[in-house]
Design a protein with these regions (language model features):
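ATP-dependent carboxylate/phosphate-activation module, predominantly the ATP-grasp catalytic core
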Residues: 183-190, 194-253, 257, 264, ...
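Short, well-ordered beta-strand elements within core beta-sheets of diverse protein domains
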Residues: 155, 288, 376-384
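A structural supersecondary motif
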Residues: 258, 347-364
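Active-site nucleotide/adenylate-binding loops and adjacent lid/helix of ATP-dependent enzymes
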Residues: 105-180, 186, 198-200, 228-242, ...
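A glycine-rich beta-turn/hairpin centered on an aromatic-Pro dipeptide
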Residues: 308-352
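ATP-binding N-terminal substructure of ATP-dependent carboxylate-amine bond-forming enzymes
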Residues: 1-102, 306-309, 315-316, 321-322, ...
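A short glycine-rich, hydrophobically flanked beta-strand micro-motif that places a catalytic Asp/Glu
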Residues: 182, 254-266, 311, 411-415
């Protein structure tokens, strides 16, 4: 184990999901710096030092790093920081989890899809703008930007007229003006998978079923709970994982995360969205508690040493969580003013609750956007195999409450556990 005491680590973006990175680094004796353009970012409040430099201002960050003798740089799970992170590391000659090629493939949906096809990994059937105009498509369609943050710019289209509008909308939300038009996979199970590469070998560390909100709440594109491990874990290991691992190896990645989202379709996964980062949320805290493997501490160590073998804990089969079940709950609310929030601290005291984050504070007005702007809190549950899962869910929902100005509950699209759909 390395002695990293006193080393300086720069973390790109101070969102609350980076709090765990700051905390872990400080526990390791590392001097932490967080930068973004927001003065009150949550992770900045925990860090030893905060910079008011936008994560996309590579020139300014590089110069500041030189002045302050920064020893390592990280972007743990923020989409817009992926390519700036690579550029900063490259110019400072600091350890980086990827190359220009890997970030090109894993940050652009179009490039990624082509790469999957080349390597025998299944993808969603796709259409061009010309197909739409000529009527050579099967509705409904799912249209999205080639690259964007969160779920912005996405549309489900049931007609040519809607598709034309959806394409225009996606183009405006994409940083490169591109879009992807695919078969809408509404009735297929959405999954999130994360691999962590150590010394060139990809290990599956996260594999979960993503459950969406209700259409009547306009949240049917927003994840309200991820259940881990997925009910399709056995199928994945038997039919899919080897192809995905070989594709990741072909990129030449030696260390770090690869995040892939897809849909279960019979005995395969049809992938649609990549990233060279860890997923958002705080699943990593649950993973470390359940298995001892730490994605956070592993990446921190790599950022400061460049050691591709320096995993903290054993990643083999850790996604199974030693037989437990994890639920990553996102609490969503209807539009309106959040007059009162109750029970947050009481939820954190529950034995099966590993973490909690209040994302949007009391008093804020929630818009009717149907996207991440309606996510107000997140909780992570780790449930032993002999414990009733729905009872644990109910304990959270009955305790954590968001009230409007009339004292009425604002929480909508609560996740309901329906048991495992596939035999393990």
């Amino acid at each position: 184990m390395y002695n990293l005491k006193g080393k300086k680590l720069l973390i790109l973006a101070g969102a609350g999901v980076h709090n765990k990175v700051v905390r872990a680094a400080k526990e390791m004796g590392i001097y932490t710096i967080v930068t973004d353009y927001l003065p009150d970012s949550p992770a900045k409040k925990l860090a030893d030092e905060a910079w008011m430099l936008n994560i996309t201002d590579v020139d300014a960050i590089v110069e500041k790093c030189k002045e302050e003798h920064v020893d390592g740089v990280m972007n743990f799970c923020i989409d817009p920081a992926q390519k700036p992170y690579y550029e900063i590391c490259k110019r400072l000659n600091l350890p980086c989890i990827g190359t220009k090629e890997t970030f090109d493939v894993l940050t652009d949906k179009r490039t990624f899809k082509d790469y999957c096809v080349q390597h025998g990994v299944d993808v969603i059937p796709e259409y061009t703008e010309e197909d739409v105009m000529k009527g050579n498509v099967e509705y409904p369609l799912f249209i999205k930007p080639t690259n964007s943050r969160g779920s912005r710019g996405q549309s489900v289209c049931y007609s040519k007229e809607e598709a034309i509008k959806g394409i225009a909308f996606a183009k405006t939300e994409s940083s490169d003006g591109g879009f992807v038009c695919e078969k809408y996979m509404e009735k297929y199970q959405d999954i999130g998978s994360a691999f962590f590469v150590v010394d060139g070998e990809p290990y599956l560390v996260k594999f979960g079923d993503r459950h969406l909100g209700k259409p009547e709440d306009n949240l049917n594109k927003q994840v309200v709970c991820t259940k881990l491990p997925s009910d399709s874990s056995d199928m994945f290991e038997a039919c899919v994982i080897d192809r995905v691992k070989e594709m990741i190896k072909s990129l030449g990645i030696k260390f770090g995360p690869v995040f892939l989202q897809g849909f279960v379709d019979g005995n395969t996964i049809r992938y649609y969205d990549p990233a060279q980062r860890m997923p958002g949320g705080d699943y990593d805290v649950i993973l470390e508690k359940a298995t001892g493997f730490s994605t956070v501490r592993s990446w921190i160590t790599f950022a400061l040493t460049g050691d591709v073998k320096g995993a903290v804990g054993n990643p083999k089969q850790c996604y199974r969580l030693n037989g437990g079940t994890a639920l990553l709950l996102t609490v969503t609310v209807r539009p309106g003013k959040m007059e009162k929030i109750l029970g947050f601290d009481d939820v954190l005291k529950m034995s099966h609750v590993i973490y909690g984050r209040q994302i949007i504070p009391e008093g804020e007005i929630i818009p009717a956007t149907g996207d991440i702007a309606q996510r107000v809190a997140a909780f992570g549950l780790l449930i032993d195999r002999d414990v009733d899962i729905q009872e644990c869910l109910d304990s959270v929902y009955n305790t954590y409450r968001v009230l409007d100005e009339n004292g009425n509950s604002m929480v909508i699209s609560k996740y309901k556990y329906e048991g495992e759909k596939n035999e393990k």
